[in-house]
């Protein structure tokens, strides 16, 4: 019977090419992790802003603003223009 040459020996790369491939994979993995971290950071930022907004709405729920205008996609978000002394003061950096 004839012996077949192994596929790995026919498609093997020089050691330096394999090292470059590993570097590219590690770079891509690092980029993917950075992208995921950026997305989580932005989601957390939005979450904090929403919590601050809800707390302000709860605190000032009995105060009627002078005018309310729709803002955002499909008018789902509302922005109330209030006198400066009525506006909620948030703690921390947003």
Swiss-Prot record:
Q: Give the compositionally biased regions (Polar residues).
A: 1-13
Superkingdom, natural source: Eukaryota
UniProt keyword list: Cell membrane, Developmental protein, Membrane, Transmembrane, Transmembrane helix
Task: Locate the transmembrane regions by residue number.
Answer: 63-82
Q: Name one Pfam family in it.
A: DVL
Location in the cell reads:
Cell membrane
Q: Where is this region: Required for DVL/RTFL small polypeptide activity?
A: 28-59
Q: Which family does it belong to?
A: Belongs to the DVL/RTFL small polypeptides family.
For this entry, the protein name equals Small polypeptide ROTUNDIFOLIA LIKE 1
Gene name, Swiss-Prot/TrEMBL:
RTFL1
């Amino acid at each position: 019977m004839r012996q077949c040459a192994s596929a790995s020996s026919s498609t093997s790369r020089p050691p330096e090419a394999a090292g470059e491939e590993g570097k590219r994979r590690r770079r891509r993995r690092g980029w993917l992790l950075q992208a995921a971290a950026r997305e989580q950071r932005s989601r957390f930022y939005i979450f904090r802003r929403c919590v601050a907004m809800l707390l302000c709405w709860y605190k000032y729920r009995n105060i009627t603003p002078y005018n309310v205008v729709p803002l955002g996609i499909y008018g789902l978000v509302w922005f109330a223009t209030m006198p400066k002394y009525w506006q909620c003061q948030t703690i921390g950096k947003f």
